[in-house]
Amino acid sequence: MKIGHIDLGERPIFLAPMEDVTDPAFRLMCKKFGADMVYTEFVSADALIRSVSKTEQKLNISDEERPVAIQIYGKDTETMVEAARIVEEARPDILDINFGCPVKRVAGKGAGAGMLQNIPKMLEITRAVVDAVKIPVTVKTRLGWDANNKIIVELAEQLQDCGIAALTILGRTRAQMDTGEADGTV
């Protein structure tokens, strides 16, 4: 499997981005025990462009972690582009956009999985971020907003047309949050 120029082998093991979990020490431990690629905690684009020190610390990566991705989330195109450029300066191997977080403080404000209710804006942000940076851009999202709006097949094609290097699909809708059985049939 390749993402951009990064060859991850035939069946790579990924350490997903997890808030308050995937700090540098945890990422290094997971690399030691076989993770082929690791992600930082997700980073708020708004906090990043305001230079919030706790957020900036999430950009600290080391060569021992490589390949490593930094994941950002937000709802404003200009803010996401500015944040993407800041992230690129931290020299990750991949920039990942989170359109999958279902929690109210993110999705309720229109970011993360909240973007599943505004697909044109999601695509606008994705295109703008892809065009703004030189590193591969990937996206993480869900099957759709709810059981009546599972749009992932069409959405995947649209995101591919925006130029993303890879797509991670959470096998649940936003309405499911992290409960119920994941749908792996897509």
Model-derived regions: residue spans:
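Flavin-dependent oxidoreductase catalytic cores
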Residues: M1-V186
